[in-house]
Amino acid sequence: ISPEPVWAPRYCTMGDIFMKLTDLSRAENIESVCMLYKIYSEVMGEDATETLDQFYGWGEMLLADFDDIDKHLADAKNLFANIHDLQEMTDLSYLTPEQEEALRNFFQHFDLERNSVLQKRFLQLWEHMYELYSRLKQAQEERGCLYEGALFRNVIERIKEDSAREEMLEKLPEHIVFAGFNVLNDVEEQLMLILKKAHRAYFYWDYDIYYTYAESNEAGLFMRHNLSLLGSELPEEFFDNISKIKDITYVSTSFDNAQARYATSWLQGELAPITRNNAIVLCDESQLLPLLHSIPHEGEPGHPKAMNATMGFPLRDTPVYSFVTALVNLQTEGYDTHRKQFRRSVLRTLLKHPYYHMIDADYAVQYTEGNNETLLQYLITLIRQVGKNFSTIESPNLYEQLYIEAIFQTHRMLQQLLQLILRDDIPLKVEQATLRRLLRNLLAGINIPFHGEPAVGIQIMGVLETRCLDFSHMLILNLEEGRLPKNIHESSLIPASLREAFGLTTIRHKIAVYAYYFYRLIQRAKRVDMVYCSGADEKST
């Protein structure tokens, strides 16, 4: 720490650095999936029987696969080759021995002669995957935007050219410090290597020798590679902390709610003074509201004088989700066209909602005539009215801060949909029933990036939000299988063996990432309370 006053450096994300190196913009996921649906419908022809809402879920999966391919600089043409050609491929020189073995393992379990109906459907789609991939990138680039992985790959391919490198590097600061990274994809790694070669990059990793130097420990999988490839500005003696004596307590509860109640006694204990050096960490973000409900109110023993929450939270668990659902149901299912009035059962749901008293009741019961554009404008208007009501609160509590952020995210998504509907090149001229289902799916999939004031009081965080942060005392809740790591599964249309063979993200990598999060979280702590549920009807330990 400098004894003299210094100017604070500028802070940015890795994504910000890539964006400085390109004139292209980053396409929103909603726009990308809708464009992909249009291309899919053209390519598959009569075989494309899915409506947009039916396509959307696995369209997101397909887009995530394309994103992963580009971020790992994989050869998409070879990956999406005809399965017969892939099986007969003799030149495997671009694969490591482990990747070559994974590819051979795939064909041991994929019988081309006796393929099932599901395999035939997979083969039918697979034959068009490269065309979908390349046409999406072409269509987006013509509009001056790309999905993130394609944009990052475009930057790396250009900066590798000697003629463009110097001009591109001039757009970046003279010195760049990379701090706290763990898992790197190939585009990030390539950019770091280019900056290191130009003597403009400095690397500060966050690790412990306990798991990093043990080859069998999955938590150090990526750190071992990073240190070997890029080096470190700090010597290893800075990173021997886990071996120091810590006070670790394991607490078993019979059901989930008891974990939230345990937090109350933890707050009341002498070992948990209310400072920003102490944190409650949730392995399951859906438990945030039960936790907040269990914390003592002002004036009660154990009530923290200051408290801050920083974590992702599912929008479907907030009142704005049920509010929008009630409005959409009213307009799409609740209107009797013969009687020219809304059905009581559907209207009653809206009238009972806590947000109903915040809106213009007369406007809320105007029928939108089955028009999608009018429906979205109707929803946006009412969401704005609710948001305006919350804006009058001078010092919102944690609940109110969370709900304000949920309202903002909902308004943002509705605005995006409206703008897409007004465009001619996006296939959102759909039946209202399709739009209704799409709205529900989109809202249910939103995770609210809830950020409070980290410099104040006790911290409540999800596991991801604790990265690069250290706490003296911690209470970790929901430390159970399926919650840490959180429901890790392969959400991909690319088979696992092929993902391994072409160097894409695999389940093994995801597990290693969460193992690192856990060890890094506790490596400098003095006291840690770990709480798990042992009930037979709950998550297994």
Each language-model region and where it sits:
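Basic/charged alpha-beta structural segments of nucleotide/phosphate-handling enzymes
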Residues: 2-170, 186, 366
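Anion-coordinating catalytic cores for phosphoryl-, nucleotidyl-, and glycosidic chemistry
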Residues: 1-13, 18-28, 168-171, 192-193, ...
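Short, compositionally biased "basic patch" segments
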Residues: 115-142, 215-243
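Residue-level signal for alpha-helix termini/capping positions
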Residues: 160, 164, 197, 268-272
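Acidic/glycine-enriched edge-of-secondary-structure segments
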Residues: 132-153, 174-177, 242-254, 502-506
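N-terminal start-of-domain structural block
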Residues: 147, 152, 157-160, 170-198, ...
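Extended, H/D-rich, highly charged conserved domains that either
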Residues: 169, 176-230
